[in-house]
């Protein structure tokens, strides 16, 4: 296995995850800002590793596997942390919706790949918008410098949940013929 800069960025994102969790729970006033900063750095590497892999023609099978895994683990852990912090339905409901969608679509992609139809459920533009809304909302909910940022984060978290459902319906619609084929 050959390591290149895009793959190393993805590995760096994975390595940041335990530090992100530890910093989140530090009993100091700067903990929310530091946790949000670590999350943002990790989120930027998610965009940057894919960009560099395509730009430098350094895509690898290992990188293609690890990138979505690192992304989903980072986001799921961030959702668990903000859900635990807020301990209210208005954060838990969108988080549960987004986590459920990721499980459903991951299973759908795997199944479609077995059928040789992976491109039928490739990432769409709405998925990219959803991811952006999700990352920004999570960063705001982690940072929470004031009540207005928290309200904006919760509102954007709901927007991300709606986009999550929309993109899931698009993926299921694209795979409908195969899903219903007996």
From Swiss-Prot:
Known function: Catalyzes the conversion of cytidine diphosphate diacylglycerol (CDP-DG) and glycerol 3-phosphate into phosphatidylglycerol. Essential for the synthesis of anionic phospholipids, thereby playing a role in balancing the ratio of zwitterionic and anionic phospholipids, which is thought to be important for normal membrane function.
EC number of the protein: 2.7.8.5
Keywords: Cell inner membrane, Cell membrane, Lipid biosynthesis, Lipid metabolism, Membrane, Phospholipid biosynthesis, Phospholipid metabolism, Transferase, Transmembrane, Transmembrane helix
Protein name: CDP-diacylglycerol--glycerol-3-phosphate 3-phosphatidyltransferase
Organism the protein comes from: Escherichia coli (strain K12)
GO CC annotation: plasma membrane
GO biological process entries: glycerophospholipid biosynthetic process; phosphatidylglycerol biosynthetic process
Record-annotated membrane-spanning stretches: 14-38, 62-82, 88-108, 147-169
Localization in the cell: Cell inner membrane
Pfam families for the chain: CDP-OH_P_transf (PF01066)
Superkingdom of source: Bacteria
PANTHER family: CDP-DIACYLGLYCEROL--GLYCEROL-3-PHOSPHATE 3-PHOSPHATIDYLTRANSFERASE 1, CHLOROPLASTIC, CDP-DIACYLGLYCEROL--GLYCEROL-3-PHOSPHATE 3-PHOSPHATIDYLTRANSFERASE-RELATED
Family label: Belongs to the CDP-alcohol phosphatidyltransferase class-I family.
HAMAP family in the record: PgsA
Pathway: Phospholipid metabolism; phosphatidylglycerol biosynthesis; phosphatidylglycerol from CDP-diacylglycerol: step 1/2
GO molecular function, one term: CDP-diacylglycerol-glycerol-3-phosphate 3-phosphatidyltransferase activity
Ranges facing Cytoplasmic side: 2-13, 83-87, 170-182
Outcome when changing residue 92 to I: In pgsA10; lower activity
């Amino acid at each position: 296995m050959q390591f290149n800069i895009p793959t190393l960025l993805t590995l760096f994102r994975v390595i940041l995850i335990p530090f992100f969790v530890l910093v989140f729970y530090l009993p100091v006033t700067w903990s929310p800002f530091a946790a949000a900063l670590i999350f943002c750095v990790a989120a930027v590497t998610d965009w940057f590793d894919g960009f560099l892999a395509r730009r430098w023609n350094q895509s690898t099978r290992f990188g293609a596997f690890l990138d979505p895994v690192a992304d989903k683990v980072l986001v799921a852990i961030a959702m668990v942390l903000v859900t635990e912090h807020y301990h209210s339905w208005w954060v838990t409901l969108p988080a549960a919706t987004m986590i459920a969608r990721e499980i459903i679509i991951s299973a759908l992609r795997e199944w479609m790949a077995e059928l040789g139809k992976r491109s039928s459920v490739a990432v769409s533009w709405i998925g990219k918008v959803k991811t952006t809304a999700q990352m920004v909302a999570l960063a705001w909910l982690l940072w929470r410098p004031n009540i207005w940022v928290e309200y904006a984060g919760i509102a954007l978290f709901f927007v991300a949940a709606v986009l999550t459902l929309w993109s899931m319906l698009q993926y299921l619609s694209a795979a409908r013929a195969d899903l219903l084929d007996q």
